[in-house]
Amino acid sequence: MTINPVSRKVAWLRVVTLAIAAFIFNTTEFVPVGLLSDIAESFHMQTAQVGIMLTIYAWVVAVMSLPFMLLTSQMERRKLLICLFVLFIASHVLSFLAWNFTVLVISRIGIAFAHAIFWSITASLAIRLAPAGKRAQALSLIATGTALAMVLGLPIGRVVGQYFGWRTTFFAIGMGALITLLCLIKLLPKLPSEHSGSLKSLPLLFRRPALMSLYVLTVVVVTAHYTAYSYIEPFVQNVAGLSANFATVLLLILGGAGIIGSLVFGKLGNRHASSLVSIAIALLVVCLLLLLPAADSEAHLAILSIFWGIAIMVIGLGMQVKVLALAPDATDVAMALFSGIFNIGIGAGALVGNQVSLHWSMSAIGYIGDIPACAALVWAVLIFRKWPVTLEEQPH
């Protein structure tokens, strides 16, 4: 399919709007991390009980990414985006109105359905809409929108929730999505589906050991991170005994450090992606190990969060870039699988953190998260040695 020639300005506006959409979708996934205590208080529940919402959301995305991608594979992309945004916005209105925890979970499942479709098509859409010769920059913009969700979206959502209530945070995200939808309707041309892949491309991807090994690494390292990260807000208040305001500051520091991580990866990622990811996983191991000892002071936790934020950003960007490089002939299927696998890790980590907090002690989330982190480090070293050229340069 050939899109009618458009000015570079319009082409970039389309990509930027998609990047804003990526920011909004990732913000709504992560923002409950900063609102757990407030949601728990409003429904008279324990924080760890509310935390199961994180696992449900992530696993719905994980399970539904590939089926939804296949079900919508022939659907015109502009129409598909409009439909999933309508579902996304309506579900946020329901989150705002939620009269009990069950209704809130149902609303989050609706958002997760929209999320599952969005992330399976976004990378390939960005490539199609990009100005000539600017595909890499377009993907970088989408990655930046994703990264900013943790850098700005989560902390801002936490601040809004702290001062105006958690319901207002969800309502604001819904309104942001509505504005973005109106921009997409105005800017996007009709986009017939192409290169979306099908079940036929799955065996092809499964026969790529470098890609499969990367998927395994993704789920293990994401599980490690989210075991601790999912409960960092109640950890700061209940274990470290620090204020709710400092919990907000810490989330800002952790997210802001992601900017440093993205700059580092942008500078060195093309040449040294494998080494950077391995070093970042090693840094994650150290951060999780030191989480409880660092809880003795605000300064120690702040310093640790800087390195933690850098590490997880480098890991996330590295994985995404490698998956796209290893599956250029089936980007939608590969990214749907990646999104699903990433969310299996989020859900698993949140569930482990939930169980540790409920049945043992929230103070142990760093130590427990360190177990899969160490396994991820060993696996990373092994696979990057076995497929150094494949992972760095080749699509097969």
UniProtKB/Swiss-Prot annotation:
GO molecular function terms listed in the Swiss-Prot or TrEMBL record: carbohydrate transmembrane transporter activity
InterPro entries to which the protein is assigned, alphabetical: MFS, MFS_dom, MFS_Efflux_Transporters, MFS_trans_sf, Sugar_effux_transptr_put
CDD domains in alphabetical order: MFS_NepI_like
Keyword Transmembrane helix found: yes
Subcellular location: Cell inner membrane
Gene3D superfamilies on file: MFS general substrate transporter like domains (1.20.1250.20)
UniProt entry tagged with the keyword Kinase: no
Family: Belongs to the major facilitator superfamily. SotB (TC 2.A.1.2) family.
Functional description taken from the UniProt entry: Involved in the efflux of sugars. The physiological role may be the reduction of the intracellular concentration of toxic sugars or sugar metabolites.
Record's protein name: Probable sugar efflux transporter
Species of origin: Salmonella paratyphi C (strain RKS4594)
